[in-house]
């Protein structure tokens, strides 16, 4: 249903979505202009290594992390990827686990797939920061119906950048119960100076049931261009993910 605000535009501040108020940086604008000057906007796919080389270099330079080319899948966004992964991985009698407060689309993805949700509330400390309740988290992971964990790193909405120790503790629990884990890391570049993001993939460096989701869209205010990077280690899941791609591999020509 349509929502009507009883205020004039100048009387309220829109804060419902994570679009920033800063314009796109000149380097990105220059690249977009160069693309526009080609004057061709037909069906587009990734047919060589250039995109992988560019993204993998960013990951090496900023996170000291690398991954094989074949693991990289592209998606119009992390949200549609969440929907697709949840549908693919979970059956009707299985559950997904997420920490609360949580990004709303984790819940929406589960609801869309008809999957029940387990929640493990984060503990709010006296100083206002949040931490994982490890006992509760493990108890929920131990549920025989639990199949998939949605992990958010950095966390939305609390803003927590998880420490390496915290990531190892969470990873150990997930691996103990052999669960799939989707690590949403879309905010990994929107961090304070002097901090460095630690991908869950660096901590779970040999765990095959990890899916990492990243995109430049939040950091660089490009969400409307609709593209994201989904790194899927498991070959069978990767094949199923790509087979269910209703866009047949097409990407934004920009």
Where are these regions (language model features)?
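Short acidic capping loops at alpha-helix termini that bridge into adjacent secondary structure
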Residues: 67-72, 92-95, 207-210
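PLP-dependent aminotransferase class I/II
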Residues: 209-254
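Conserved PLP-anchoring active-site segment centered on the Schiff-base-forming lysine
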Residues: 88-110
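A short helix->loop->beta-strand "cap" motif at the edges of active sites that frequently abuts
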Residues: 94, 115, 176-179, 207-208
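N-terminal small-domain helix-loop-helix segment of the aminotransferase-like
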Residues: 1-77, 84
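Active-site phosphate-binding strand-loop segment of PLP-dependent enzymes
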Residues: 124-192
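A short helix-loop-beta submotif of the ANL/AMP-binding
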Residues: 112-118
